[in-house]
């Protein structure tokens, strides 16, 4: 960042203005004045909330102008190292959309220090670039620090079944809110790379926590950013209070945090002779784990439901879905992911990949090329995020219209209820997107089963056949001993990868599942009631 040289003519959001009188006039427009006033008011307000104490924290707002596209609008940013409760409009910096400082605050007499633009500036500009935001807030609120300390090795904050989740864009009461956590650094500007990675890995998030530091929150406008920041801080505070009470904020019931020993699903109180579902407890698996990680296809759900129902539905409706929702933010996110994947496929000679024509040829031809690529991906049964995310959104339409109903094996609800009653945490890890996973269990043939799950993982954690993916899940859940988690899958290669990470593993034998290698060395089950 820098200041244009004296006497030069600069291009500010598409308008050629000089750096002297023209710049001065431009800085005095109504939009810039209002944005400066608003930013100073919000600084004073957020100081009272404890977000901007000790000169910490910062805010930035785009200068709204209907005649200028948001990516090219001017940016107002609060300064660094000043008393936020005493902020006035003249204290604000004004930057161009590409980060050049156009206006600096005036010098103030002792004991004030010379003005300095906040160290958050490169992070703010990165959020503007990646999320087309209208405002970004960086809070040092105490709750945003402490919540990252509760699970010191976790890379995510998760919470569900709280009313204030509805205040976060794209989330409802039953949804699981996931906020990525990045590690703090000595200098704020050094966070840009990890912030970029977090925003890329979590396309739905509107916040990123910085461990032992604070949180960045953004929205389409200053109102959206402020409202969501208030909701995030409420949820962080709720998690801390629940933790103090020994209650689990990450589960639907927010029940006691338990350490389970002995037989799963019976609190260790059942006698050895008791029969369960026709199985003797002598035949049941008795691990000491406190978490279960479940696959879906071939484990909780028949393979035929996926291959004969879900995949054909997505295949038959991809063109219709893209045409009907093409301009929506959700579908544009899907299309951007597909573009990246298709470009990668073309560069690597993947069969079925075809180039996407430029937008000016018309929407119909562009959609047709996407359909051709997606159909090729479906035929090849590729487990890639771009495809899984789009399929999930197509299936959402099917579930909402009651054209689709999720299917689980008959033993699944009973087992989930038993584990839940015993305080055992259950998670899902599937190649399908998190959203698709929740659709299956919220619209199942046994009703809404989501209350039994503590979280959902997809391939954003990594490939299911790679060991590092399971290490990531362990770190996210906050489990110190890998053997405290039991993984249930029908895929031998996944079982091998999970075992290499230290998890206990059993293989699910269900109708329609593929054969296993001879002498595979894993315990097998035919029903969850064996666990």
From Swiss-Prot:
Co-factor remark: Binds 1 zinc ion per subunit.
Cofactor(s) the protein requires to work: Zn(2+); Mg(2+)
Superkingdom of source: Eukaryota
Catalytic center residues: 163 (proton donor/acceptor)
GO molecular function: acireductone synthase activity; magnesium ion binding; methylthioribulose 1-phosphate dehydratase activity; zinc ion binding
Keywords (A to Z) from UniProt: Amino-acid biosynthesis, Hydrolase, Lyase, Magnesium, Metal-binding, Methionine biosynthesis, Multifunctional enzyme, Zinc
Keyword Iron-sulfur included in the entry's annotation: no
Region of interest: Methylthioribulose-1-phosphate dehydratase: 1-248
Binding site for substrate 1: 120
Pathway assignment: Amino-acid biosynthesis; L-methionine biosynthesis via salvage pathway; L-methionine from S-methyl-5-thio-alpha-D-ribose 1-phosphate: step 2/6; Amino-acid biosynthesis; L-methionine biosynthesis via salvage pathway; L-methionine from S-methyl-5-thio-alpha-D-ribose 1-phosphate: step 3/6; Amino-acid biosynthesis; L-methionine biosynthesis via salvage pathway; L-methionine from S-methyl-5-thio-alpha-D-ribose 1-phosphate: step 4/6
Catalytic activity: 5-(methylsulfanyl)-D-ribulose 1-phosphate = 5-methylsulfanyl-2,3-dioxopentyl phosphate + H2O; 5-methylsulfanyl-2,3-dioxopentyl phosphate + H2O = 1,2-dihydroxy-5-(methylsulfanyl)pent-1-en-3-one + phosphate
EC numbers: 4.2.1.109, 3.1.3.77
Record-listed Zn(2+) binding positions: 138, 140, 213
GO CC field: cytoplasm
Pfam families: Aldolase_II, Hydrolase
Binding-site residues, substrate 2: 430-431, 464
PANTHER family per UniProt: ENOLASE-PHOSPHATASE E1
HAMAP family: Salvage_MtnB_euk, Salvage_MtnBC
Assigned protein family: In the N-terminal section; belongs to the aldolase class II family. MtnB subfamily.
Protein name: Probable bifunctional methylthioribulose-1-phosphate dehydratase/enolase-phosphatase E1 2
